[in-house]
Amino acid sequence: STRKESSAASDVYKRQDVDFADLIRRINAIPGDFIIRFMSSHPKDATEKLFRAMAECEKCAHQMHLPVQSGNDRVLHAMNRGYTREKYLAQVALARQYMPDLVLTTDIIVGFPGETDEEFQDTLSLIETVRYDAMFTFIYSPRVGTPAAKMPDPYTRAQKQVRFDALVAAANRISEEKHRAYEGSVQRVLVDLSLIHI
């Protein structure tokens, strides 16, 4: 869309009676050949109304980045994420009900202060259940001024690295398995030139 159309869409979104799902529908109604794609959604904002709009708007990519961070409820609570593993999995199931072809990506942090091996196993089991198309994985690093930076942490960087390596190996395997399902098919793609460093 043109800058003028983009600005108009931004003005519409500032109105209190228009939420993000409504905005997607309004942008979808703009004439032209384009794809609607948004970068990230906090699980609290991933609603059935949003999934329905994404499914019904033919210009909207069936792609969502839904950061989970951890598959363990205690760790999620310590992170102040505002949802549980069960609630997150229910959102994923609902999104895929509306969009069976949904491409789903996520962020995961390993080694959050106090995360045990058993709690990390919950994260591994979650990614096996969800089967993300891609994951952005990180080893926790403290940020000054945050509550987590003051939490006791008995685990070493080396122990966290072992978990990280296991997570990356599982993520890569799942991603490859999912991508192989597209072999022999023809797909319309969106090339993001801002990600290409020449």
Listing of model-derived features with the role each one plays in the protein:
Residues 1, 15, 80, 112, ...:
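Pocket-edge positions in alpha/beta enzyme catalytic cores
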Residues 1-9, 13, 196-197:
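Single conserved hydrophobic/aromatic residue that forms the stacking wall/gate
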Residues 7-117:
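Conserved SAM/AdoMet-binding glycine-rich loop
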Residues 64-66, 135, 189-191:
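OB-fold and OB-like beta-barrel modules that bind single-stranded nucleic acids
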Residues 90, 94, 122, 126-129, ...:
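A non-catalytic, amphipathic alpha-helix used as a structural packing/dimerization or gating element
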Residues 101-149, 153-154:
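N-terminal intrinsically disordered, low-complexity, charge/repeat-rich segments that act as generic
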Residues 139, 150-195:
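Terminal RNA-binding accessory module
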